[in-house]
Amino acid sequence: MTENEIRDLLFNNHKEDLHTLIIQMREPLALPQDTFPSIAQLLQNRTETKINAMVENLETLRLDGKEVRLVRDSDTTTRIDLLGSIADSGDLVIIELKKSGQTERQAFTELLGYANHFCTLFPPLSESSLQSILIAPMEGRGVRDALAQELIINEKNALALIPKIVGEKIELEAYYPSELYYRWVENNVLDDSSMTVVTASFPIIEGWIDAGE
Protein backbone atom coordinates (compact mmCIF):
# COMPACT_ATOMS: atom_id res chain seq x y z
CA MET A 1 0.00 0.00 0.00
CA THR A 2 1.51 3.32 -1.10
CA GLU A 3 1.43 6.62 0.78
CA ASN A 4 -1.29 7.94 -1.53
CA GLU A 5 -3.36 4.80 -1.02
CA ILE A 6 -3.03 5.08 2.76
CA ARG A 7 -4.00 8.76 2.63
CA ASP A 8 -7.03 8.04 0.45
CA LEU A 9 -8.05 5.10 2.66
CA LEU A 10 -7.99 7.27 5.78
CA PHE A 11 -9.87 10.12 4.13
CA ASN A 12 -12.49 8.08 2.28
CA ASN A 13 -13.17 5.35 4.85
CA HIS A 14 -12.29 6.90 8.20
CA LYS A 15 -13.19 10.55 7.85
CA GLU A 16 -14.96 10.61 11.21
CA ASP A 17 -13.63 7.54 13.02
CA LEU A 18 -9.86 7.65 12.59
CA HIS A 19 -9.50 7.18 16.34
CA THR A 20 -10.86 3.62 16.05
CA LEU A 21 -7.70 2.63 14.15
CA ILE A 22 -5.36 3.56 17.00
CA ILE A 23 -3.97 0.62 18.96
CA GLN A 24 -1.50 -0.21 21.73
CA MET A 25 -2.07 2.77 23.98
CA ARG A 26 -0.45 2.45 27.38
CA GLU A 27 -1.22 3.65 30.85
CA PRO A 28 1.02 6.54 31.97
CA LEU A 29 3.93 5.56 34.17
CA ALA A 30 2.71 5.13 37.74
CA LEU A 31 4.48 7.43 40.17
CA PRO A 32 5.86 5.88 43.38
CA GLN A 33 3.68 6.41 46.43
CA ASP A 34 6.27 5.89 49.14
CA THR A 35 9.06 8.10 47.78
CA PHE A 36 9.35 11.37 45.90
CA PRO A 37 9.42 10.63 42.14
CA SER A 38 12.50 11.41 40.10
CA ILE A 39 12.54 14.09 37.40
CA ALA A 40 12.55 11.35 34.75
CA GLN A 41 9.48 9.70 36.27
CA LEU A 42 7.60 12.99 36.50
CA LEU A 43 8.40 13.85 32.87
CA GLN A 44 7.43 10.40 31.62
CA ASN A 45 4.13 10.44 33.51
CA ARG A 46 3.27 13.93 32.26
CA THR A 47 4.23 13.18 28.64
CA GLU A 48 2.41 9.85 28.44
CA THR A 49 -0.68 11.45 30.01
CA LYS A 50 -0.52 14.16 27.34
CA ILE A 51 -0.18 11.62 24.52
CA ASN A 52 -3.24 9.74 25.78
CA ALA A 53 -5.20 12.98 26.04
CA MET A 54 -4.32 13.90 22.44
CA VAL A 55 -5.47 10.47 21.25
CA GLU A 56 -8.73 10.81 23.19
CA ASN A 57 -9.32 14.20 21.58
CA LEU A 58 -9.33 12.49 18.19
CA GLU A 59 -12.66 10.82 19.04
CA THR A 60 -14.43 13.88 17.60
CA LEU A 61 -11.94 14.46 14.78
CA ARG A 62 -13.36 15.02 11.32
CA LEU A 63 -11.07 15.01 8.30
CA ASP A 64 -12.05 18.00 6.16
CA GLY A 65 -9.54 17.84 3.33
CA LYS A 66 -6.69 15.94 1.71
CA GLU A 67 -3.74 17.32 -0.23
CA VAL A 68 -4.65 20.78 1.01
CA ARG A 69 -2.55 23.39 -0.77
CA LEU A 70 -0.72 26.05 1.19
CA VAL A 71 -0.46 29.31 -0.71
CA ARG A 72 3.09 30.62 -0.73
CA ASP A 73 4.99 33.22 -2.69
CA SER A 74 7.38 30.67 -4.20
CA ASP A 75 6.82 28.47 -7.24
CA THR A 76 6.81 25.35 -5.07
CA THR A 77 3.35 24.16 -4.07
CA THR A 78 3.20 22.64 -0.62
CA ARG A 79 0.36 20.28 0.22
CA ILE A 80 -0.82 18.97 3.57
CA ASP A 81 -1.71 15.29 3.38
CA LEU A 82 -4.75 15.52 5.64
CA LEU A 83 -6.39 18.42 7.44
CA GLY A 84 -9.13 18.11 10.01
CA SER A 85 -10.76 19.69 13.02
CA ILE A 86 -11.87 18.51 16.45
CA ALA A 87 -15.55 19.17 17.02
CA ASP A 88 -15.37 19.57 20.81
CA SER A 89 -12.67 22.24 20.83
CA GLY A 90 -12.47 23.49 17.25
CA ASP A 91 -8.74 22.76 17.21
CA LEU A 92 -7.08 22.12 13.86
CA VAL A 93 -5.35 18.80 13.17
CA ILE A 94 -2.58 18.58 10.59
CA ILE A 95 -1.56 15.09 9.47
CA GLU A 96 1.58 14.28 7.50
CA LEU A 97 2.06 10.77 6.15
CA LYS A 98 5.37 9.07 5.32
CA LYS A 99 5.62 5.35 4.72
CA SER A 100 9.40 5.39 4.30
CA GLY A 101 11.69 5.66 7.29
CA GLN A 102 14.21 7.56 5.16
CA THR A 103 12.06 10.69 4.85
CA GLU A 104 10.17 10.70 8.15
CA ARG A 105 12.56 13.14 9.87
CA GLN A 106 12.10 15.68 7.10
CA ALA A 107 8.35 15.12 7.18
CA PHE A 108 8.23 15.88 10.90
CA THR A 109 10.15 19.11 10.35
CA GLU A 110 7.69 20.08 7.61
CA LEU A 111 4.78 19.22 9.90
CA LEU A 112 6.00 21.66 12.54
CA GLY A 113 6.49 24.24 9.81
CA TYR A 114 2.90 23.84 8.68
CA ALA A 115 1.71 24.57 12.22
CA ASN A 116 3.76 27.77 12.30
CA HIS A 117 2.42 28.72 8.87
CA PHE A 118 -1.18 28.43 10.03
CA CYS A 119 -0.42 30.65 13.00
CA THR A 120 1.00 33.21 10.55
CA LEU A 121 -2.08 33.06 8.32
CA PHE A 122 -4.45 33.41 11.28
CA PRO A 123 -2.80 35.63 13.94
CA PRO A 124 -5.32 34.82 16.73
CA LEU A 125 -4.48 31.14 16.29
CA SER A 126 -1.85 29.72 18.63
CA GLU A 127 0.04 26.44 18.48
CA SER A 128 -1.92 25.28 21.52
CA SER A 129 -4.96 25.14 19.21
CA LEU A 130 -3.13 22.94 16.70
CA GLN A 131 -2.38 19.25 16.86
CA SER A 132 0.33 17.88 14.59
CA ILE A 133 0.24 14.17 13.75
CA LEU A 134 2.97 12.26 11.96
CA ILE A 135 2.01 8.87 10.55
CA ALA A 136 5.34 7.17 9.90
CA PRO A 137 7.37 4.06 10.86
CA MET A 138 9.34 6.02 13.51
CA GLU A 139 12.40 3.92 12.72
CA GLY A 140 15.02 6.65 12.59
CA ARG A 141 16.79 8.00 15.64
CA GLY A 142 16.48 11.52 14.28
CA VAL A 143 12.70 11.60 14.13
CA ARG A 144 12.34 9.88 17.51
CA ASP A 145 14.68 12.44 19.08
CA ALA A 146 12.82 15.30 17.41
CA LEU A 147 9.43 14.14 18.64
CA ALA A 148 10.71 13.64 22.17
CA GLN A 149 12.23 17.14 22.09
CA GLU A 150 8.97 18.74 20.97
CA LEU A 151 6.87 16.81 23.49
CA ILE A 152 9.10 16.91 26.55
CA ILE A 153 11.01 20.18 26.20
CA ASN A 154 8.94 22.41 23.90
CA GLU A 155 5.55 21.03 25.06
CA LYS A 156 4.11 20.96 21.53
CA ASN A 157 0.91 19.10 20.66
CA ALA A 158 2.74 16.54 18.53
CA LEU A 159 1.68 12.94 18.11
CA ALA A 160 3.20 10.05 16.16
CA LEU A 161 1.30 7.03 14.89
CA ILE A 162 3.00 3.99 13.35
CA PRO A 163 1.04 2.49 10.41
CA LYS A 164 0.48 -1.26 10.47
CA ILE A 165 -0.83 -2.59 7.16
CA VAL A 166 -2.96 -5.74 7.42
CA GLY A 167 -4.13 -6.71 3.95
CA GLU A 168 -6.36 -3.88 2.77
CA LYS A 169 -6.80 -2.54 6.28
CA ILE A 170 -4.64 -0.30 8.42
CA GLU A 171 -3.99 0.11 12.13
CA LEU A 172 -2.19 3.02 13.78
CA GLU A 173 0.03 2.24 16.75
CA ALA A 174 0.47 5.07 19.24
CA TYR A 175 4.15 5.93 19.69
CA TYR A 176 5.60 6.73 23.12
CA PRO A 177 9.18 7.96 23.64
CA SER A 178 11.51 5.51 25.35
CA GLU A 179 12.20 6.00 29.05
CA LEU A 180 15.83 6.61 28.05
CA TYR A 181 14.86 10.08 26.80
CA TYR A 182 13.51 11.06 30.19
CA ARG A 183 16.67 9.84 31.88
CA TRP A 184 18.74 11.83 29.41
CA VAL A 185 16.81 15.02 30.25
CA GLU A 186 17.19 14.33 33.96
CA ASN A 187 20.93 13.75 33.64
CA ASN A 188 21.35 17.02 31.76
CA VAL A 189 19.25 18.98 34.23
CA LEU A 190 21.26 17.65 37.17
CA ASP A 191 24.63 17.89 35.42
CA ASP A 192 27.25 20.04 37.17
CA SER A 193 27.59 22.23 34.08
CA SER A 194 23.89 23.10 34.34
CA MET A 195 24.20 24.47 37.86
CA THR A 196 25.72 27.61 39.30
CA VAL A 197 26.41 28.00 43.00
CA VAL A 198 26.85 31.48 44.44
CA THR A 199 28.07 32.28 47.94
CA ALA A 200 27.95 35.67 49.59
CA SER A 201 29.51 36.92 52.82
CA PHE A 202 28.86 40.14 54.71
CA PRO A 203 29.71 41.56 58.14
CA ILE A 204 27.40 41.06 61.07
CA ILE A 205 24.87 43.90 61.32
CA GLU A 206 23.86 44.74 64.86
CA GLY A 207 20.23 43.93 65.51
CA TRP A 208 19.62 42.32 62.12
CA ILE A 209 21.11 38.87 62.58
CA ASP A 210 21.33 37.09 65.91
CA ALA A 211 24.97 36.07 65.81
CA GLY A 212 24.49 33.89 68.86
CA GLU A 213 22.36 31.35 66.97
Residue ranges with predicted function:
Residues 1-213:
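Charged, terminal alpha-helix-loop-beta segments
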